[in-house]
From Swiss-Prot:
Pathway: Glycolipid biosynthesis; lipid IV(A) biosynthesis; lipid IV(A) from (3R)-3-hydroxytetradecanoyl-[acyl-carrier-protein] and UDP-N-acetyl-alpha-D-glucosamine: step 5/6. It catalyses: 2-N,3-O-bis[(3R)-3-hydroxytetradecanoyl]-alpha-D-glucosaminyl 1-phosphate + UDP-2-N,3-O-bis[(3R)-3-hydroxytetradecanoyl]-alpha-D-glucosamine = lipid A disaccharide (E. coli) + UDP + H(+); a lipid X + a UDP-2-N,3-O-bis[(3R)-3-hydroxyacyl]-alpha-D-glucosamine = a lipid A disaccharide + UDP + H(+). GO terms for molecular function: lipid-A-disaccharide synthase activity; phospholipid binding. Keywords: Glycosyltransferase, Lipid A biosynthesis, Lipid biosynthesis, Lipid metabolism, Transferase. It comes from Shigella dysenteriae serotype 1 (strain Sd197). GO terms for cellular component: membrane. Its EC number is 2.4.1.182. This is Lipid-A-disaccharide synthase. The gene is lpxB. NCBIfam families: lpxB.
Length: 382
């Protein structure tokens, strides 16, 4: 940033979630520096905030080995072109938003050219492939982390990291309105309600749906009024779930929802879900939960070798203890899942204590992440 040139921030977002984060960051930066310039790889939300898109976000949003191999030449071209053009532009700061396989190498290239670099959203280095922390440390001037235990991990390796809180925690109220959510979904206020979330990936839905449905059947024996809501991320997952339900629980009445996972969590007395971001969202919705997860035996064996954490779900990692019951592999079966969910549906001491801890954890990570990220960028730009 000079008197002649406005503050110039380069950004690369690799998928929709990164576009949302990038838009929030740009908005917060514009409030402080109205004439700042933003350039890079951007989606529609970032562009709406004024980011000049050299490439569209879809160019980088590829998943799976086959897809990546099919697009490898194009990805390498974009990577080389961005290295060259950012090197010529000399932005005040480069911010790589998520997409670590693409961005961390790019950050390293730019840092060698004297450009200050930030990686926004820590990869799960604290959980597996921990040696990546050294590459990240070489490539970046600063990591922006959503969760406090991530910062503690980077501190251990003397990699500069700033805990900024989680944008999802900012977006969700500390005290969600259960009855309002039930009104939206058409669920009576005075019944018990269970949310089933068997995952967003096809393999997860295939592995978990049958056991989740059988668990719901067992629970309905105790709670005949039990309303069961099943939010599914898209039409493909819905068709898959309906096929499995027709095979294992054709007579079980459920409410299938197109999306609306957050509303389902807020409306429910308890949730049974696959691990992942859904567990964090469920915690923020203040919905007591059980995590059930199964994968192919070899994959699980490999994961046990590679994963270095005591827990798989984010609520437990945040709490540093088994706050939420995790039933994995052979433990993930209807009798055990139902036994873990029964006390939560009773709305007694167990669920109230879990709710209170969820609220405390929500407050810990509710830090206005967009503002915190913008402040970090401006401090580095000085």
């Amino acid at each position: 940033m000079t008197e002649q040139r406005p503050l110039t921030i380069a950004l690369v977002a690799g998928e929709t979630s990164g576009d949302i984060l990038g838009a929030g960051l740009i908005r917060a930066l514009k409030e402080r520096v109205p004439n700042a310039r933003f350039v890079g790889v951007a989606g529609p939300r970032m562009q709406a905030e004024g980011c000049e898109a050299w490439y569209e976000i879809e160019e980088l949003a590829v998943m799976g080995i086959v897809e990546v191999l099919g697009r490898l030449r194009r990805l390498l071209h974009i990577h080389a072109d961005l290295t060259k053009r950012f090197g010529e532009l000399k932005p005040d700061v480069f911010v790589g938003i998520d997409a670590p396989d693409f961005n961390i190498t790019l950050e390293g290239n730019l840092k060698k050219q004297g450009i200050k670099t930030i990686h926004y959203v820590s990869p799960s280095v604290w959980a597996w492939r921990q040696k990546r922390v050294f590459k990240i440390g070489r490539a970046t001037d600063l990591v922006l982390a959503f969760l406090p235990f991530e910062k503690a991990f980077y501190d251990k390796y003397n990699v500069p990291c700033r805990f900024i809180g989680h944008t999802m925690a900012d977006a969700m109220p500390l005290d969600p309105d259960k009855n309002a959510a039930r009104d939206v979904l058409g669920i009576p206020h005075d019944t018990h309600c269970l949310a089933l979330l068997p995952g967003s990936r096809g393999a997860e839905v295939e592995m978990l749906s049958a056991d989740f449905l059988k668990t719901a059947q067992l629970l309905r024996q105790t709670y005949p009024d039990l309303e069961i809501v099943v939010p599914l991320v898209n039409a493909k997952r819905r068709e898959q779930f309906e096929r499995i339900k027709a095979e294992v629980a054709p007579d079980l009445s459920v409410h299938l929802l197109d999306g609306m996972g957050r509303e389902a969590m807020v409306a429910s007395d308890a949730a049974l879900l696959a691990s992942g971001t859904a567990a964090l969202e469920c915690m923020l919705a203040k919905c007591p939960m059980v995590v059930g997860y199964r994968m192919k035996p070899f994959t699980f064996w490999l994961a046990k070798l590679l994963v270095k954490t005591d827990y798989v779900s984010l609520p437990n990692l945040l709490a540093g203890r088994e706050l939420v019951k995790e039933l994995l592999q052979e433990e993930c079966e209807p009798q055990k899942l139902a036994a873990a969910l029964l006390p939560l549906l009773a709305n007694g001491k167990t669920s109230h204590a879990m709710h209170d801890t969820f609220r405390e954890l929500h407050q810990q990570i509710r830090c206005n992440a967009d503002e915190q990220a913008a402040q970090a960028v401006l401090e580095l730009a000085q």
